[in-house]
Curated annotation (Swiss-Prot):
UniProt GO cellular component terms: cornified envelope; cytoskeleton; cytosol; desmosome; nuclear speck
Compartments where located: Cell junction; Nucleus; Cytoplasm, Cytoskeleton
Species assigned in the record: Rattus norvegicus (Rat)
Compositionally biased intervals (Polar residues): 416-427
GO biological process, one term: keratinization
Any coiled-coil regions, as ranges: 79-261
Major site of localization recorded for this protein: other
Pfam families: SAM_1 (PF00536), SAM_2 (PF07647)
Protein name, as recorded: Kazrin
Protein family per UniProt: Belongs to the kazrin family.
Domain SAM, residue spans: 451-516, 529-593, 617-684
Gene from which this protein is expressed: Kazn
């Protein structure tokens, strides 16, 4: 359209220029005509035809000019505005020509008499007139052509105006459509923003629900594991009760053989001793209705005798000859027993016969003795069939439902005086607890070489949180000296410690106590139990997802000081290289503060509100710092990432680029990355000198060394070797997925480190430690 308009304008300009040229030519012709007329008037023409011919010629010229002017005026009256000025000029020139004609006529009249000879002949004038007529005809044709061009230009102008109107209408419609599109786009954008906000709120709600469900699932898992451990303890207790019931069954069978003989021998004050070791059955304490019924069945033909109120002693060899002692001697023997005898077979049998530990067999004692023995055998066979491993939480609760029949209230009879029985049970449990606490107090104040068997068991159960090995320890370890002399093979075979990390924990603790006996105090790492490591410490370094693994393997402060990358990857399921480095740097920080929880907490408390001492910053403190530097939209990416102050300060390859990658800042946002680099340079670069001053203040040892420095045992029975330092941690600055080789360190104190860790099917029952996956035993 624009090209057509340009061409039309060029054509109009060309037509106007051609008209101007034709007008110029006409002016030149008129000028030439006037010049010739002047020459004719000056030459004097013929005598008869000169003045008349000149006058007629001038009149004809004037007429032609007038007609031409009139024609031009008629044709140019409706022309365009650009041609009007030319018409006015032509009119002025015509007026001038008329004046010149009048002047020439006057001159001719004055010079008619003397210039006749100079007048041109009529033939020449005719020729000139013909030429002028031809020129006027050409001028007329030119004017007609100009008029046709004007009409054509007018039509083209009309077409152009109509096209411009159509173009304007099209533009207006397009503008209206564009306004509608912009209006709809704004509306859709607002709707999409509202939808995005709603989705974000829904996402936050779902995230909170997800974490709540995870927390509930974790609590349910911990609860199930606790129930599982309790059920295992009850299993062990049931086995002990079954053994005691078997012994009681043999004793009852012995009593049933010679009833008349025992009745004749049961005189007041008479005492018969059989064997060296005896279990006490006091008759003056309340018996269950089933035992009384069985006694009535056995002695229905004999009258009541005062000896029934006395205590009967049955030797462990189950001889047929019973022994009877008085109430006073039995009570004196009970008073003389120490709290350490509570767990003895004598005390357990005494508690069983007094109704303190109800079992599933007591329900069958309501029938005669023979019937009860048959029921006992049937129940044993059923229990052997029902025994199976814990494969899932459903089995745990299924076994819990089966154990509901062990409620002591089901075995009580209306005549059995249940209140004294339960009271005696609570008293026995309280005595056991007091005895255990006394032994734990001895652990604190007595060297290990002076420990007795009970102290060793209390230390293993309470301090080391390993109750699963107490039974084997009670059978094989009778003193602290024996415990100090145990090798790794002895720990595995004698105590059933098949887990390499559990053996390492025991070995480190034993060597720590050995060093304490040599004149040094216990290491500060001994104060960090596995609960603090799994719950508090892992949460501080931002790796709480590994809490359950550390909890299951009972990783305490001493074990932290011995962990290497291989241990983290093989035993604790820490497969990510950066997480391994984060844990090792956290251990390095603990070493710098000499494993002192108080010093670490004091330094963290002082830098909670100001950006100082960043080496002790927790993962949560790093998140707070990221939010403070206006990067809160990326702060949540550091949750459970393992980024803490020790990584930012002690690892030189963890620079601003690695921090930006951990935060999830896109590589294209250079301004944000530069801002992060500047903030890190102002906070973390001066941290090295500050950390040195802090470590000097809190008394950090000058060099890194393990708390275990012995090369072997004093008796030479083990080839244990201990590392005194750590190898380099490796490069982590090039991102978190680098494939650099690991610098594994060997822990040489464990000769059989892989004792069945990968093959659980062939282990003995005491080695299957998955049953004790969650032990809630805290240090005293």
């Amino acid at each position: 359209m624009m090209e057509d308009n340009k061409q039309l304008a060029l054509r109009i300009d060309g037509a106007v220029q051609s008209a101007s040229q034709e007008v110029t030519n006409l002016r030149a012709e008129l000028t030439a005509t006037n010049r010739r007329l002047a020459e004719l008037s000056g030459g004097g023409g013929g005598p008869g035809s000169g003045p008349g011919a000149a006058t007629s010629a001038s009149a004809a010229a004037v007429t032609v000019a007038d007609s031409a002017v009139a024609t031009m005026e008629n044709h140019q009256h409706g022309a365009q505005v650009l041609l009007r000025e030319e018409v006015v000029q032509l009119q002025e020139e015509v007026h001038l020509l008329r004046q010149m004609k009048e002047m020439l006529a006057k001159d001719l009249e004055e010079s008619q008499g003397g210039k006749c000879s100079e007048v041109l002949s009529a033939t020449e004038l005719r020729v000139q007139l013909v030429q002028k007529e031809q020129e006027l005809a050409r001028a007329r044709e030119a004017l007609q052509a100009m008029k046709a061009d004007r009409k054509r230009l007018k039509g083209e102008k009309t077409d152009l105006v109509s096209q411009m109107q159509q173009l304007y209408a099209t533009l207006e419609s397009r503008e209206e459509q564009l306004r509608d599109f912009i209006r709809n786009y704004e509306q859709h954008r607002k709707e999409s923003e509202d939808a995005v906000k709603a989705l974000a709120k829904e996402k936050d709600l779902l995230e909170r629900e997800k974490w709540e469900l995870r927390r509930q699932a974790k609590e349910a898992t911990d609860h199930a594991a606790a129930l599982r451990s309790q059920l295992d303890l009850k299993d062990n207790r049931m086995k002990e009760l079954e053994a005691e019931l078997a012994m009681a069954k043999q004793s009852l069978a012995t009593l049933t053989k010679d009833v008349p003989k025992r009745h004749s021998l049961a005189m007041p004050g008479e005492t018969v001793l059989n064997g060296n070791q005896e279990w006490v059955v006091q008759a003056d304490l309340p018996l269950t209705a089933a035992i009384r019924q069985s006694q009535q069945t056995l002695y229905h033909s004999h009258p009541p005798h005062p000896a029934d109120r006395q205590a009967v002693r049955v030797s462990p060899c189950h001889s047929r000859q019973p022994s009877v002692i008085s109430d006073a001697s039995a009570a004196e023997g009970d008073r003389s027993s120490t709290p350490s005898d509570i767990n003895s077979p004598r005390h357990r049998t005494h508690s069983l016969c007094n109704g303190d530990s109800p079992g599933p067999v007591q329900k069958s004692l309501h029938n005669p003795i023979v019937q009860s023995l048959e029921d006992l055998e049937d129940q044993k066979r059923k229990k052997k069939k029902e025994k199976m491993g814990f494969g899932s939480i459903s089995r745990v609760f299924a076994r819990g439902k089966q154990r509901k029949s062990l409620d002591p209230g089901l075995f009580d009879d209306s005549d059995s005086q249940c209140s004294p029985t339960r009271h005696s049970l609570s008293l026995s449990e309280g005595e056991e607890q007091m005895d255990r606490l006394q032994h734990v107090e001895l652990v604190r104040t007595t060297p290990m070489s002076h420990w007795k068997a009970g102290t060793v068991q209390a230390w293993l159960e309470v301090v080391m949180a390993m109750p699963m090995y107490v039974k084997a320890c009670a059978e094989n370890v009778k003193s602290g000296k024996v415990l100090l002399s145990l090798s790794d093979e002895d720990l595995e075979l004698g105590l059933g410690v098949c887990s390499s990390l559990h053996r390492r924990k025991l070995r480190l603790a034993i060597e720590d106590y050995r060093d304490a006996e040599a004149g040094r105090s216990l290491s500060k790492a001994a104060d960090l139990d596995h609960h603090w490591v799994a719950k508090a410490w892992l949460n501080d370094i931002g790796l709480s997802q590994y809490s359950q693994a550390f909890q299951n393997h009972l990783v305490d402060g001493r074990m932290l000081n011995s962990l290497m990358k291989r241990d983290l990857e093989k035993h604790l399921n820490v497969s990510k290289k950066f997480h391994q480095v984060s844990i090792l740097l956290g251990i390095e920080l603990l070493y710098q503060v000499n494993f002192s929880r108080e010093a670490l907490q004091e330094r963290r408390a002082r830098c909670e509100t100001q950006n100082t001492d960043p080496v002790v910053w927790t993962n949560q403190r790093v998140l707070k710092w990221v939010r403070d530097i206006d990067l809160k939209e990326y702060a949540d990416n550091l949750t459970n990432s393992g980024v803490h102050g020790a990584v930012l300060v002690l690892e030189p390859t963890f620079n601003a680029e690695a921090m930006a990658t951990a935060l999830g800042i896109p590589s294209g946002k250079h301004i944000l990355r530069r801002h992060l680099a500047e903030e890190m340079s102002t906070v973390f670069h001066p941290a090295n000198s500050t950390g040195i001053r802090e470590s000097e203040r809190f008394g950090t040892p000058p060099g890194r060394a393990s708390s275990i420095t012995r090369a072997g045992k004093e008796d030479g029975s083990s080839n244990s070797k201990y590392r005194t330092g750590r190898l380099p941690l490796g490069k982590i600055g090039r991102g978190f997925s680098s494939k650099e080789p690991d610098y594994y360190d060997d822990y040489g104190s464990l000769e059989n480190e892989d004792c069945g860790d990968d093959d659980l099917q062939g282990r003995p029952e005491q080695c299957r430690l998955e049953e004790y996956s969650s032990l809630e035993v805290t240090n005293v």
